[in-house]
Every structure is written in structure tokens, then in C-alpha cells.
Regions:
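DNA major-groove recognition helix of helix-turn-helix/homeodomain DNA-binding modules
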Residues: 48-63
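Short amphipathic recognition helices of helix-turn-helix/homeodomain-type DNA-binding modules
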Residues: 65-68
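Residues within the alpha-helical elements of helix-turn-helix
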Residues: 16, 27, 56
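Short alpha-helical "recognition helix" segments of helix-turn-helix
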Residues: 23-25
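A short, Lys/Arg-rich alpha-helix, primarily the initiator
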Residues: 1-17
């Protein structure tokens, strides 16, 4: 189970950076509709595009595992 909402995190980071999803898409060499589809995807976006989006926004990704 993912404990945070990565889709919302990407949207918030775009807002904080003053960038649109279209601008992020251009930064990573993909289309705006593709970025939008990935962000809204029901089963999450933890894939290469997710990593590229956060790196384009100036972030490293840290995954924390918590024992249940």
C-alpha cells in the first residue's frame, strides 16, 4: 500500500515550481496529454516518467519502507 498520494504530490510540485504540466512534459520530451494521463492513472505513476517529472522539477526521490 502506498502511504502517500504521488499524483497529488506531482501536481503540488508543479504549482510550487510555477510550471504547468505542459511545461513539465516539454522538459522531459513527452506530450502534455501523456503527462496528464500518467498523473490521473488509477494504478499510480511510479515509473520512468514519474522519475523524470520530479527530476525536471529539481527533486530527488526518496522511498521509505515502513514495517506494518
Amino acid at each position: 500500500m502506498v502511504r502517500n498520494n504521488i499524483e497529488v504530490d506531482v501536481k503540488v510540485k508543479c504549482i510550487e515550481a510555477g510550471l504547468t504540466q505542459a511545461q513539465v512534459a516539454e522538459m522531459i520530451g513527452t506530450s502534455s496529454p501523456y503527462v496528464n494521463r500518467i498523473i490521473k492513472k488509477q494504478d499510480g505513476i511510479v515509473n520512468k516518467t514519474f522519475v523524470q517529472m520530479l527530476e525536471a522539477l529539481g527533486y530527488d526521490i526518496e522511498i521509505v519502507y515502513i514495517k506494518r
